[in-house]
Amino acid sequence: NRPREYDGSHIHFVGMNPEISLREHQRNAIAHVLYGGNTLLAHEVGAGKTFEMAASAMEAKRLGLCQKSLFVVPNHLTEQWAAEFLHLYPNAKLLVARKKDFETANRKKFCARIATGDYDAVIIGHSQFERIPLSYERQERIIQEQIDETLAAIEELKANAGENFSIKQMEKTRKTLETKLEKLRSDARKDDVITFEQLGVDRLFVDESHFYKNLFLTTKMRNVAGLSTSEAQKSSDMFGKCRYLDEITGGRGVVFATGTPVSNS
């Protein structure tokens, strides 16, 4: 089965800088984002991913496919991203996070601006994104699901006389998850923050998405290159947010972009 090919030659980009004309592969990539659901833009550096993502967000909003796009980009590139976005769409209404916006005293106010403002796009850094939590209930549900999956895998290994080493590894994973759940319950975020779900974001664009690898995986295999049973917190946070967007958009709300899509951890 050949994957569907997308043709963006027909798209009329309203509000785009008339001095810029997008290349064919860029137009086709935008068509893929608009009509093809969750998308990975895995072009080499210099292929124009920034313009692809900006135009995808503007067209999606214009066509009523989304209301608010959030761009998550490397911390040092937020200003550059905003400049390129405005070069392509001079009248775009952007909200760009500065470092001080996520200091404890200012974070709630900034998140309220995201939630209440009618922006074409909000641009924040990778580390700032992590500081907007999913609701406590959703985080609890995700960890509990992982515990249940791990327990089921342990039972299956025991029933099939699996290796002791694998069972011990799984038990260790279960304990780690239970500790994580206890910590979540004791923290329960006392500082009354606005949660990710309350932002009103219904499309997420992640630049340099390869930084979000090492996601937790329940697996009975061991020592397999690229399979991680230890977890990077930022990756589990990203995964939870993507799952939420899948729920509210039917699997059409997430766009990842990277020049290096595959690398062993």
Where are these regions (language model features)?
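P-loop (Walker A) phosphate-binding loop of NTP-binding proteins
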Residues: 44, 74, 260
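Pre-Walker A (Motif I) flank of P-loop NTPase domains
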Residues: 35-41, 67-68, 120, 251-254
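Histidine-centered active-site/metal-ligand motif
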Residues: 25, 43, 210
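Generic enzyme active-site microenvironment
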Residues: 41-42, 205
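Interdomain "pre-motor" coupling segment immediately N-terminal to P-loop NTPase/helicase cores
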Residues: 1-4
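SF2 helicase/translocase NTPase motor core
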Residues: 8-21, 49-56, 61-242, 246, ...
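N-terminal pre-P-loop "Q-motif" helix
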Residues: 18-37
